[in-house]
Amino acid sequence: MKLIIFTGLVLFAIVSLIEAEEESGRACILLYGECTKATGSCCSNLIYDCYRKLKKGVQIARQCFCSEKDVIYKKDI
């Protein structure tokens, strides 16, 4: 009986810690990570760049990625 109560208390403590960790804040998104739904979640040394996906001139999607500050990417032809 004591073992069952102890096991229940341990499981309750683990679940509480997991929930508290989730509420306290998520980890930042690393370099080249997709941040379309959370543009403000890039790590502090990164910025987010967003791109529009066009099909026949009509926007069909938008994607954002965390990238390095002061770095410019150009399309290679």
UniProtKB/Swiss-Prot annotation:
Molecular functions (GO terms): toxin activity
Post-translational modification: Contains 4 disulfide bonds.
Keywords, in A-Z order: Disulfide bond, Secreted, Signal, Toxin
Subcellular location: Secreted
Pfam families for this protein: Toxin_35
Residue positions assigned to the propeptide: 21-26
Annotated signal sequence range: 1-20
Domain of life the protein comes from: Eukaryota
InterPro entries for this protein: Spider_toxin_CSTX_knottin
Tissue: Expressed by the venom gland.
Gene Ontology cellular-component annotations: extracellular region
Family, as annotated: Belongs to the neurotoxin 19 (CSTX) family. 10 (U11-Lctx) subfamily.
The name this protein goes by in its record: U11-lycotoxin-Ls1c
